[in-house]
């Protein structure tokens, strides 16, 4: 499958170390660094997941005209992902999330980022480049990966979504708060529970599936969403398309780190939807894939062979 990915570029940076003493300067641990590592995050991680699953991703994003932007592009190239759709902006910095980890536990996370919307010039560049790609490639699905860092604007989404609808290409969205209500007329909308409740402005009990169903159905109809997919972390997922609204529990497993699980879920769900799989299979596959990456520390893509083996064991 060929997939267009649009969204925020992030470098997930890790300092792995050990803590053996407390600082004499303040009551904080001293971490002796053993290893440093950088990985593509955000829309980059979705692209890596897609490639690991056998798809061809075309990523469109904006980075700063800085060393970290060059690093991000190098990480993509090393992962076998084209950087033709990565545009630079000297007025922005490339987003970096730096995590310090000891014995599998996060000590602290430090974010360096720009959150303002991209300018109209970059907006136009991305829209034009995507239009040309759609004219020359058979694209199976378009995924919008929004981390509220400014790449996805209401105008960019609207223009690209119109192109997708006119060509019969399904669209999937992994939203954040800022543009939550801008995403209308999409094929798949995948917030987590916190994003969903904040987005609709209603407090819900995560265990009250009847209330979630009512709120989800109302929102889905209002936004004209074909398939609404809400992840509920340890409780599994809720998925509904109007004809069927159902909760699917999570498989019990050890959780090491939830970072990047949402990227994996939107990747698997989008491919499954584009392949016209049924709602139950989409839910189980995505649920399973998200759980697999939660068993590893840091932002990592799903392993295709491991996913296939687990699916066979679960008779999916």
Go through the PLM ranges and name each one.
Residues 3, 24, 28-96, 310-312:
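Substrate-binding N-lobe of the ribokinase-like
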Residues 86-92, 99-136:
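Conserved phosphate-binding/catalytic loop of the ribokinase/pfkB sugar-kinase fold
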Residues 222-226, 251-314:
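Conserved post-catalytic alpha-helical subdomain immediately downstream of the catalytic base
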């Amino acid at each position: 499958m060929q997939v267009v990915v649009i969204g925020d570029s992030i470098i997930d940076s890790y300092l792995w170390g050990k803590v053996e003493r407390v600082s004499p300067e303040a009551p904080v641990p001293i971490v002796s660094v053993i290893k440093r590592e950088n990985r593509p995050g955000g829309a980059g991680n979705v692209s890596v997941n897609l490639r690991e699953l056998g798809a061809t991703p075309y990523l469109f994003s904006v980075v700063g005209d800085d060393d970290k932007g060059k690093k991000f592009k190098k990480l993509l190239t090393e992962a076998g992902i084209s950087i033709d759709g990565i545009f630079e902006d000297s007025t922005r910095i490339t987003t970096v999330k730096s995590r310090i980890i000891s014995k599998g536990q996060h000590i602290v996370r430090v974010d360096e980022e720009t959150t303002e919307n991209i300018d109209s010039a970059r907006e136009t560049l991305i829209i034009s480049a995507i239009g040309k790609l759609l004219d020359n490639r058979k694209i199976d699905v378009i995924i919008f990966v929004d981390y509220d860092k400014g790449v996805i604007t209401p105008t960019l989404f609207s223009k690209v979504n119109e192109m997708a609808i006119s060509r019969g290409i399904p669209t999937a969205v992994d939203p954040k708060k800022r543009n939550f209500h801008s995403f209308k007329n999409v094929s798949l909308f995948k917030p987590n529970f916190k994003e969903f409740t904040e987005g609709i402005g209603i407090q819900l009990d995560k265990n009250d599936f009847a209330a979630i169903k009512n709120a989800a159905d109302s929102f889905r109809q209002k936004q004209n969403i074909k398939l609404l997919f809400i992840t509920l972390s340890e409780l599994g997922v809720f998925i509904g398309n109007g004809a069927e609204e159902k909760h699917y529990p999570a498989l019990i497993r050890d959780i090491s780190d939830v970072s990047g699980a949402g990227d994996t879920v939107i990747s698997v769900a989008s491919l499954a939807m584009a392949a016209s799989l049924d709602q139950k299979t989409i839910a189980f596959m995505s649920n399973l894939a998200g759980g697999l990456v939660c068993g590893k520390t840091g932002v990592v893509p799903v392993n295709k062979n491991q996913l296939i083996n687990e699916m066979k064991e679960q008779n999916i």
